[in-house]
Design a protein with these regions (language model features):
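Metal-dependent polysaccharide deacetylase catalytic core of the NodB/CE4 family, i.e.
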Residues: 2-148
């Protein structure tokens, strides 16, 4: 599954009422307010599995293939944001959420930094610096899979 979570929404921090699970998403509304709820695939699938536990074999969920050009899981972790005051905090929060997802049965993979053609990119290692630090697999165009 390729899940694109850009800056206008993000996966929330751990929700302790849900057994420490990353249970909700935040979405910035047109009026600037923040709405929190099950607005994306991750919390929707978690809600479904809570109601139908036999759906998930041994607690497994899905593989989330991340890109990195706008950041990870809606957090501004891309190097283009390195001069912003919240950059280090955003990276730490994204790493915590990524670990929470792993602990809850989700797998994380790299879908490259931004749908790069790895063999012809000017900077083919950019995905390693920006995405591979939270994943153990690479999925390219849904056809190739690599695990180190």
């Amino acid at each position: 599954m390729l899940l694109s979570i850009y800056g206008w929404r993000r996966i929330c921090k751990q929700d302790r009422s849900r057994r420490g699970r990353t249970a909700t998403c935040e979405m910035k509304m047109d009026d600037g307010s923040i709405s929190t709820g099950s607005y994306d695939l991750i919390p929707l699938l978690n809600d479904f599995i809570d109601e139908h536990p036999d759906f998930s074999y041994k607690g497994a969920k899905a593989i989330i293939a991340l890109t990195g050009y706008e950041g990870i899981l809606g957090y501004r972790t891309a190097s283009s944001y390195s001069e912003t005051p919240d950059y280090e905090s955003e990276k730490e929060q994204a790493a915590r959420v990524a670990q929470c997802l792993r602990d809850d049965g989700w797998e994380l993979a790299s879908h490259s930094w931004g749908h790069l053609w790895m063999g012809v990119s000017d900077d083919p290692e950019i995905h390693t610096r920006s995405v591979m630090n939270v994943s153990t697999q690479i999925r390219i165009n849904g056809k190739m899979r690599w695990s180190p």
